Amino acid sequence: MNYSITTLGKKTIAGFHLVGPWDQTVKQGVEQLMMWVENHQVPAREWLAVYYDNPEEVPAEKLRCATVVAVDEDYVIPANSEGVILAAVAGGDYACARARVVDYDFATPWMQFFDSLLQSTTYRVAPRPCFEIYLNDGNHDGYWDIDMYVPVERVAS
């Protein structure tokens, strides 16, 4: 899979932190997020899922993720937003790849991306969360176009 290296600034995010198998929690979290954004007219700049763990090292029932929207740095969570967190995704260097997801199979493009990235002799995966940005409404379109971001650091030569 082709990817590029890009430097991103910090992203302020608001949404829901969930624990459990990602194939269940992300879908549930996105549904919660959509209702919250609509009910509170949240000025969402981007829609993201943030992944905090390595599924090869952490049992599925303990996997952490957040379904969030990017908001302005000074955003204040509105009243009656039970369970909503305000956090940040760290800035820095990221490997970025675009993929189309069909049949809710988000795992396959991520595995292909990591397979390509792990072959790099210039960059290695950094110990920070990965995330994906949704470029369209997959529930409406029948597929999702996503940009996947993996934090990286240059390998010392």
UniProtKB/Swiss-Prot annotation:
Cell compartment(s), UniProt: Cytoplasm
Sorted alphabetically, the keyword list is: Cytoplasm, Stress response
Q: Pfam families, alphabetically? A: GyrI-like
- Keyword field contains Coiled coil: no
What GO molecular function terms would the record report? DNA topoisomerase type II (double strand cut, ATP-hydrolyzing) inhibitor activity
Q: Which GO terms describe its cellular component?
A: cytoplasm
What domain of life does the native source organism fall in? Bacteria
Give the matching SUPFAM superfamilies.
Probable bacterial effector-binding domain
HAMAP family, per this entry?
Answer: DNA_gyrase_inhibitor
- Subunit and partners: Interacts with DNA gyrase.
Q: Which family does it belong to?
A: Belongs to the DNA gyrase inhibitor family.
Function statement: Inhibits the supercoiling activity of DNA gyrase. Acts by inhibiting DNA gyrase at an early step, prior to (or at the step of) binding of DNA by the gyrase. It protects cells against toxins that target DNA gyrase, by inhibiting activity of these toxins and reducing the formation of lethal double-strand breaks in the cell.
The name this protein goes by in its record = DNA gyrase inhibitor
State the organism named in the record: Klebsiella pneumoniae (strain 342)
Q: What is the lineage of its organism?
A: Bacteria, Pseudomonadati, Pseudomonadota, Gammaproteobacteria, Enterobacterales
- What gene name is given for the protein in this entry? sbmC
